[in-house]
C-alpha cells in the first residue's frame, strides 16, 4: 500500500466516523510568534482545546505537514543516519473536542489498524499510563488485547506525572494520560518491548499515540477533571507506511525511494544506499514546504533554520561530487509525489524552485573554498592524533566564508571529531565586543534604574506640563544634578515622548521650565516601561525632582506618523500584489521615509511597484479612520491582527485597524488614512538572499519629490527639444542615432587599425626567427588592439607582439603570439611582464592575452624591455 493510499484511507475512515476532514495548516503557526514551526497535528486546534476558539465541528481529522528542525524539537543532526528521523513528516490525526473519549478513540484506532490496514492483531502491543485503569480495561476487556501485550508505564522521567504516557501542554493547563500502540517487527530484529532495558531497539516501533485530555493542572500541581474531555491522536505517516510496506526504515517506503532515486539522478550517484541521498531526499520536503508557507532563507528565526537545512543538503551533494547547483531540480520530483495531496505545493512550484536555486548559487560561491580549508585543517588534526577542531578556525569559517558552526560540527562529527565550541564562543564574543567598541550608540539598557514606570501620554498629547524628573544619568552613571553643556539621559514620571520601538524612531523635542532648557535629541527605553530622554542641557541646572514641560517636535512626529501608517498599508498591499509569503523582516520609520524589508525572492517589477502605490494611495483617498483597541493577545490574533515573529507581546496588546490593514502595533499613527497625503516608493532593492527592501516617502516629502521629478523631466525634454509627453519617443530616437554613430566609429577604428598595422609591421625586429613588436597604438580601444594584433600575427607569420594604448590615465595591453612561437613564448607571460611594470596584471591563453595598468609613465620603458625578455627565451 503506497503512502498516498495510506493517507487517503486514514482520512476517509475518520470521515466515515463523523469527522470533518480539515486541511493541513501552515508550517508557520498562524499568529503565534512563540512557536517556531508547526510540529504536530494539534497545533492548529490549540485554541479549541484551551476553550478560546470554537469550530463548527466537534470531530476532526487531518494529515498535518510538520517540521522538527529548530529549538526544542530539533531532529536535524540525526536525519539521514537513523531509520526514522526526519525534518519534515506528516502527522495523521483524529481529534475530539468534548465529543467522544477513551472508548471510541481506542475502538477507532483498533478498527483502522486491524480492519482497514489489516495489520495482524498479534503484532500490536499497547502501553497505558500506570494509573489509567480505564484505558487498560478497554484494551483488555473490550478490544481483547492479551494482558502480556499491555504494558503500564509509570512516572519514568523523574517527577510526578512526568511519564512517556502522560501528556501535558505546559506546566499548567490541559493534560492527561495517553496510550501508545506499537508494532512488533519480530524476533529477527533486536529490541525489547516498551519499558524494558532494550526498548530503544528497532523491534517494537511506536506507530500511534492517543492522548486523553482529561485534567486541568493548576500552578500548585493539583489535578481537576475537565468539564469537556477531549482526544488528540497522532500517527506518523512515514512510520505507518514502513510497517505496511514491510520495511524497517522509513527511507525504504515508496515516497522516499522515489525521492532518493531522484536525488541520485541529479547528483549522478550510483549507490542508492548512500546516507547523503537520504539526507537530500528528506531535506527537499522540509525546504520546499517551508518556502510554500512563506519562509525565506535568512540569518535569523525560521529563515535561518531553513538556510541550515538547505546548506546541509548542498553539502551532502558536495560530498557526492556535485560541485554545482542541483537541489532545486528535485522540486519537480517532490511535486510529482505530493502535489496531489497538497495542491499548494504544485501552485508554488516555480517560486520554490527559484528560491532554492538562488540559495544554492549563493552558497556554492563560498562552499568550495571553505570546505577545502576545513578538510585541510581536519587532516592536520588527524595527522597529529587529535580529535578536536580549533574553535578559532571554526569561527574564521563562520565569519569569513559563511559556514554556520553547526555545518562545521556536522562535518567534524562524520570524521569522529568535535569542535572546540567554547573557543568559538570566545572568538564570537571578542568580535561583538570590538563591534560595540567601534560603533557609536546610546547605552540605555545598562542604566541602573529601580524607580516607577513612566506614564506615556504620547498617543493623545504632544506636550505634558507637569513632568517630574525622577532620574538623571551622565555617561552611564546616576547623578543628582546636570549642568549646562552636559549630555545626559533624563527619566520623567510622565512624558509624551515616544521611545524608539518597533522600527519607529524616538521623538525629539524640549524639556523646559522658566530657568532650564534640555534639548532632546532622541528617546529610548531604559527598561520595558521606562523612557529615557537623551540630549543636552542648553540652559540652567537640572536636578532630580524638578518639574518641566515636556514638548515633542510636533512636525517631526507628524511626518513620522505618516510614514509609519503608510508602512502598515504598504505591508498589506505587498501581500496582495506579491502573495501571502511576504513577511516583514525589518523596518525603520523616521520623519524622512519608511524603510521596509520583507521576504520575497525576486526584484519588484515596475508594474508591481505601481500596483502597490495605487493600492496604498487608494486607501489614502478613502480617508478611513484609524481605530485603536487594546485587548488580550489571543483575542487580537483570533480577530485577524497580524503578529510578527520575533516580537514580544504582553497579555494585553494594541491593535490598529487602518483602512484594510490590521496589525499589532505600539507605535504612533495618523487619525485617518487621508492624513498621509501621498505615498511614493523611491527605492527598491535586495539586502540579502530572499530579502527585498523598499523605501517610500509620504506627505510633503512625496509632493516635493514629485515636483523635483517633474522639473527634471521638463529639463530633459528641453535639452532634447521635445515636449515632456514626447520624451520616451525622443530618447529612443537619440539612442538609435548613438548606435548608428558608434557603428560608424567602430568601422573607422577598424580601418585605422588596418592602416596602422601595415605601418607597425615594418617596425618588427627579428629575433631568432621570431618577429618581435612592442608598440603603442594611440586612440585605440581594447577591441581595436585585438584586431590589430590578429592582423599583425597573420602578416608576420611567426611573431610575438605587444600593443598598448593609454586613455584616462589607464593602460590597456594586448599580447599575441603565433602558434610556432608560442612553443617558447607564452602570451600570458609576455603581457604580465609588461603589466607588472605599469602597475597592473593580466592573463589569457598562450596565443592571446590581455592586461591593464595604472602607471602609464612606465610604459615606454616596459615596451623597450620586451625584445630582451623574448631573446632570453628563444
From Swiss-Prot:
Q: Does the keyword Amino-acid biosynthesis apply?
A: no
Name the cofactor(s). Zn(2+)
Q: Which GO terms describe its molecular function?
A: alanine-tRNA ligase activity; aminoacyl-tRNA deacylase activity; ATP binding; tRNA binding; zinc ion binding
Q: What class of enzyme is it?
A: ligase
InterPro entries, per the entry: aa-tRNA-synth_II/BPL/LPL, Ala-tRNA-lgiase_IIc, Ala-tRNA-ligase_IIc_anticod-bd, Ala-tRNA-synth_IIc_core, Ala-tRNA-synth_IIc_N, Ala-tRNA_ligase, Ala_tRNA_ligase_euk/bac, DHHA1_dom
**Keywords, sorted A to Z:** Aminoacyl-tRNA synthetase, ATP-binding, Cytoplasm, Ligase, Metal-binding, Nucleotide-binding, Protein biosynthesis, RNA-binding, tRNA-binding, Zinc
Could you give the cofactor binding note from the entry? Binds 1 zinc ion per subunit.
What superkingdom does the record give? Bacteria
One BP term from GO: alanyl-tRNA aminoacylation
Q: Does the keyword ATP-binding apply?
A: yes
Q: Which GO terms describe its cellular component?
A: cytosol
Q: Which residues form the signal peptide?
A: none
Enzyme Commission code(s) on record: 6.1.1.7
Q: Kindly provide the name given to this protein in its UniProt entry.
A: Alanine--tRNA ligase
Protein species of origin? Burkholderia vietnamiensis (strain G4 / LMG 22486)
